[in-house]
C-alpha cells in the first residue's frame, strides 16, 4: 500500500480503532462496524490498534495481551476485511517485526525526534506516520520527515495531536495543519488524543470526549487530509485511553456530518 491509495477519492481518509488490542473478538467486531460505515460513506479506511501500549503513566497500567498475540490479531483483521493496518512502534528493534503484520508504522509523539526509530521505520518500506510532539512547532516536523525521506522512504504522513498547554491540558492550533501541509506530506488530525488531559494526580490520563465532534469538524473545515480517532464499544471499560475515546455507536453519525462538511469545501 502507498499513500496514494488513501487519497484516491476527494474524501478525507480515516485511521480508527481501539487504543490497544484488548482481545481478538472485540477487535474484529470494531473493525467490522467501521468497515461497514466507511464503505457506506466512501471513506478510505485504515484500522488502528496498538499491539503494545508502552507509554503509560503507571507500572500497573495495561500495556497489551502480548506482542505476538496482538500482532496476529492485527494480521487477522487485515486478511478478514482486506484493509490496511496501522500500529505504533516504540524502538528501532520493533520496526521490522511489526512491518510483517501491518501497512503503516506510527511514531508516537513523544518519540518523533528519535533518529534511530525513524530510520528503522523508513527502512521497512512501509508508510511512516509521524505524530507531532506536543512540544514541537509544526514547522519543526520537517526535520523528522526529512530523516525518513533521507533514509530512502518518501511515504510519510504527519499527524497533529495537540500542543501542551500548561501542565494538564492540550490545545490544537489549527494554523499548524496548513503549515505542515506545505512540507509536502499528508496531514492527519488526531482528534481523540488532542482532547487528552495528561498528568493527572491519579496517574490516569483524563479527557474531554464531549468535544470530539467540535475538534473533528474544525479539522475538516481547515482542510486536513485525514482523521485519526480511537473508538471503543464502551469507553468506560476500555483498558487504555477510555477517557478520551469516541463511543463506537456515535461514529457513523459523526462521520456523516464530516463528509457533508468536506463536500462543501
Task: Set out the residue ranges of the language-model regions.
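N-terminal amphipathic alpha-helix/helix-capping segment at the start of soluble metabolic enzymes
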Residues: 1-15, 72, 263-265
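Active-site mouth loops of central-metabolism enzymes
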Residues: 16-29, 57-65, 83-88, 107-109, ...
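Glycine-rich, proline-tolerant flexible connector loops at the mouths of alpha/beta enzymes
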Residues: 14-27, 45-67, 231-241
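Catalytic beta/alpha-barrel core
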Residues: 65-66, 80-94, 103-116, 127-138, ...
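Conserved beta-strand positions in the central sheet of alpha/beta enzyme cores
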Residues: 15, 46-48, 86, 106, ...
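Catalytic alpha/beta core domains of metabolic enzymes, predominantly
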Residues: 7, 125, 129-231
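A short alpha/beta connector and helix-capping loop motif
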Residues: 27-31, 35, 95, 100-110, ...
